[in-house]
Amino acid sequence: MRKNRLGNFPSMALDVTVDNAMVFYLGGTYNEVGKPNENYGRELLELFTTGIGWYTEGDVKEAARVLTGWKASRFNDQPAPKGIYNTWFDANKHDTGAKEFLGVTIPARTVDNNTEFQVLNEEVFELIKIIFRVRPDAAARFIARKAYLYFVYSSKGDVDESFVNDLAAEFRAANFDIKPMLK
């Protein structure tokens, strides 16, 4: 998170999505083809990007399918291809079927293109980009509101909606780069 703290929010969201701590904390390690774990998919939408009301239960399920196969090793007795405390991808646990997220199709993949690099770039990053492409106003406003509540005034009852709208417009105009919004 530190790397992108004032950078591009979608890039930070991608980093957080496949971060070992997040994968482990929200049960991503148990998110596998045939039994997707919806925890992170829901949090990504509800708490990190758009807020409630901008997605369906089906979108949460499809986000969970996109995120199948990512593992986090925490202990020495667990598989750890990249060492403990590192995220890794198990292609055998990834759902290779097509996904429909926020009305956009993420194509199915074959065994040949079901690698960590390809899934990260063609599915996980695409998932993040879809949120900001399909729901740009909702995401900009939601994140600007969080910034306002953190940096300006913490009482949710006294939010200056006009100021939040200005922050959101700046954030969106800057292609979701954080620093211009905070200036």
Language-model segments: which ranges?
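Active-site substrate-binding loop specific to GH73 endo-beta-N-acetylglucosaminidase modules
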Residues: 1-183
